[in-house]
Amino acid sequence: MSSPRERGKSLMESSGSEPPVTPSRYESQKRRDWNTFGQYLKNQRPPVPMSHCSCNHVLDFLRYLDQFGKTKVHVPGCMFYGQPEPPAPCTCPLRQAWGSLDALIGRLRAAYEENGGPPETNPFASGAIRVYLREVRECQAKARGIPYKKKKKKKPTPEMGGGREDSSSSSSSFSFS
């Protein structure tokens, strides 16, 4: 049996004689999402090549996916609007949950660049997509009576050395500026 390090190494240095490594669940889902989005673009009239894809196509795709959603989102006129656990069924629509859409966009954003798309033109990284996701999150939180609370980032305390256990490590000199 090989160690995790050796298995990871075989991913990077795979020869033709070794069996292919099974992709992770995330990688499989990312590939499936990428193929689904590509098929969606091909089914447009006229078909849209990936090189001409814009954030508007992505927004249309997200709206298209709503029809397959499983999350009840009460409309403002519904008597259960704002109730986390309504006592009876209603006719409000089922939608894609915000968390599912957010995760989908994250995977498609990564897949776009992995498939040769330049980061500067990544339609999944557009501000319009972030605004749409924020609106969906807020709308669903109000409709279900569950306030969304953003998790606060922990600030490193000065006495702990900025949150690093070993400030002499080589990674401490690298920064994204």
Swiss-Prot record:
* Subcellular location, principal: nucleus
**TM ranges:** none
Does the keyword section mention Membrane? no
Low complexity: which segments have biased composition? 168-177
| Location(s) in or outside the cell | Nucleus
Keywords from UniProt, A to Z, are: Developmental protein, DNA-binding, Nucleus, Transcription, Transcription regulation
The processes (GO biological process) annotated in the record are: mRNA transcription; post-embryonic plant morphogenesis
Q: Which GO terms describe its cellular component?
A: nucleus
Q: Where in this protein does the record put region Disordered?
A: 1-31, 144-177
Span of domain ALOG: 25-152
Per the annotation, the residue ranges of the short sequence motif Nuclear localization signal are 150-154
Q: Known Pfam families for this protein?
A: ALOG_dom (PF04852)
Q: What is the annotated role of this protein in its UniProt record?
A: Probable transcription regulator that acts as a developmental regulator by promoting cell growth in response to light.
Family membership, please give it: Belongs to the plant homeotic and developmental regulators ALOG protein family.
Name the UniProt record assigns to this protein:
Protein LIGHT-DEPENDENT SHORT HYPOCOTYLS 10
Tell me the gene name: LSH10
